[in-house]
Amino acid sequence: LAGWYGVLAYILIDEFKLQKINNIDTLDYDPLAKNVGRILFAPKDAENIKGGKATFVNYKYKDIRKLKYDYLNKFSLVTCTSCEHLAQKDIDHVIDRLHSDTLVVLQSNNYKDCNQHINISNDINEFRSLYTDKLDNVRAYVKPFINYDRYMIIGTRRKK
């Protein structure tokens, strides 16, 4: 979700060694993100193809508020590294449509000086509490920076 040109998709392709990744969809509300991602990662795609590694990044222009269960239930991992840019009800909409035991990775921060940050949490406990009724086995992490803290939680979609 909020794919940021597919950066995380390419990190997963290069670094995730536990099992083969068959398919990665990177979703963005900005239709230009697909074009930027394709240009940005064209050399990486060429390198992967030359090296015999297929690239499975599907750029999707989608409004997450309209995602349906039949689309979301095919994924075993869903990430959003920019929760601060999304309304909480929209994040909840996605999580509510995931199948049980889907691995969910969410990141946010407490940086208040960006007018595009519409959904920040004051601390990791507040961020984590947003998902206590939706996720099980939650692990929480904080990365301090000079002007703000970055939060990450990892959990599995609670059984419905």
What are these regions (language model features)?
Residues L1-A2:
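Conserved beta-strand/loop positions that form the S-adenosyl-L-methionine
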Residues Y5-Q19:
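Conserved SAM-binding loop of SAM-dependent methyltransferases across substrates and taxa
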Residues I21-L27:
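Short beta-strand element of Class I
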Residues Y29-L32:
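Conserved SAM/SAH-binding beta-strand->alpha-helix loop
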Residues K34-N73:
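S-adenosyl-L-methionine
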Residues K74-K89:
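A short SAM/SAH-binding and catalytic strip from SAM-dependent methyltransferases
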Residues A87-Y151:
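C-terminal substrate-binding/active-site "lid" region of AdoMet-derived donor-dependent transferases
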Residues I154-K159:
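Conserved beta strand-loop-helix elements of the APE1-like EEP
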